[in-house]
């Protein structure tokens, strides 16, 4: 008799995705982040659901409803801090996952890569709208500043901003719709993640060498299911350490002050995971130029498959490209740091230099170095 997991219409989908999936035998721990992102998404949906049961999306009661969750709801403080820090863990895993894709040339799977970039945009939109919900000072002013950027769009800008706000400023209508979108988007992300996996399983996983590994595949279960569970345990340990010991380490203390439209905080800045893009936005004196640079700083990821000039897929055997890759990583750390600094000398010029370097590395240096390496290898 054939095993039910191979014949049942539903179970065989799970079987071909997580049990009998042929997987390259040499994939390293860098391939763990896909499953870790799945875990982060599940944590966020579950904790978010319980928070939504007690949260009210009204400007008068939003802040106090979050206080009520932390003070009066059973383990409400834990759920709230797990949700807030879960976003940080999500982005740490996302950045490492994207970095892995860049380093090992996974972007040559066009569909998988492009859906991944769309997923990144969706997660960023969800995180931004979630940050507005507690209705603290940084929530209100962050929402005001970021939505206001759309007014830079010629002709329709102002109308578009007022349409998103549902009025002439960030107010009750804005908060209500942001809550609605923040609730629905994670389910859209989950659906997109399934499409992401579908396209990945069409081609099979990449591996550190970047070579075709059809001759050396092993079943996903038990080898990589065990490896993923180890990743889960490490992530949960680090995550719960952060939540239980320093829950406000990555947050902004200004958000413990209720939103006040009459009092602007001295330094308006987003959460740490948006700071690199925020630094690029601030580096350009022109409003429209800044917005375009901000969008393009993420959208540029879609150009990687086109800009790939190397004869080899992975950077594993390309030391010059490796060097440039780590310079890019250092540049992103610099941009993140500058995004959190006040707009004054020397941070302005440093931010501009780091922004120029970011785009130059991706658009010019990477393809040039790849062509040089081809020449050195006489290819």
Curated annotation (Swiss-Prot):
What PROSITE patterns does the entry give? CYTB_CTER, CYTB_NTER
Please give a single GO biological process term from the UniProt record: mitochondrial electron transport, ubiquinol to cytochrome c
Subunit organization? The cytochrome bc1 complex contains 11 subunits: 3 respiratory subunits (MT-CYB, CYC1 and UQCRFS1), 2 core proteins (UQCRC1 and UQCRC2) and 6 low-molecular weight proteins (UQCRH/QCR6, UQCRB/QCR7, UQCRQ/QCR8, UQCR10/QCR9, UQCR11/QCR10 and a cleavage product of UQCRFS1). This cytochrome bc1 complex then forms a dimer.
Positions bound to heme b b566: 97, 196
Main localisation: mitochondrion
Family according to the record: Belongs to the cytochrome b family.
Provide the taxonomic classification: Eukaryota, Metazoa, Chordata, Craniata, Vertebrata
**Can you tell me which residues bind a ubiquinone?**
201
Role: Component of the ubiquinol-cytochrome c reductase complex (complex III or cytochrome b-c1 complex) that is part of the mitochondrial respiratory chain. The b-c1 complex mediates electron transfer from ubiquinol to cytochrome c. Contributes to the generation of a proton gradient across the mitochondrial membrane that is then used for ATP synthesis.
Q: Where is the signal peptide?
A: none
| Membrane-crossing residue ranges in chain numbering | 33-53, 77-98, 113-133, 178-198, 226-246, 288-308, 320-340, 347-367
What are its GO cellular component terms? mitochondrial inner membrane; respiratory chain complex III
- InterPro entries named in the record: Cyt_b/b6_C, Cyt_b/b6_C_sf, Cyt_b/b6_N, Cytb/b6-like_sf, Cytochrome_b, Cytochrome_b_C_euk/bac, Cytochrome_b_N_euk/bac, Di-haem_cyt_TM
Q: Which Pfam families match?
A: Cytochrom_B_C (PF00032), Cytochrome_B (PF00033)
Bound cofactor: record note: Binds 2 heme b groups non-covalently.
**How is this protein positioned relative to the membrane?**
Multi-pass membrane protein
The record makes one more remark, namely: Heme 1 (or BL or b562) is low-potential and absorbs at about 562 nm, and heme 2 (or BH or b566) is high-potential and absorbs at about 566 nm.
Q: Which GO terms describe its molecular function?
A: metal ion binding; ubiquinol-cytochrome-c reductase activity
Q: What is the effect of changing residue 253 to P?
A: In strain: Isolate SP802 and Isolate SP805
Q: What UniProt keywords apply to this chain's record, in alphabetical order?
A: Electron transport, Heme, Iron, Membrane, Metal-binding, Mitochondrion, Mitochondrion inner membrane, Respiratory chain, Transmembrane, Transmembrane helix, Transport, Ubiquinone
Record localization = Mitochondrion inner membrane
Binding positions for heme b b562 per the UniProt entry: 83, 182
Protein name (database record): Cytochrome b
Cofactor(s) of this protein? heme b
| Superkingdom of the organism of origin | Eukaryota
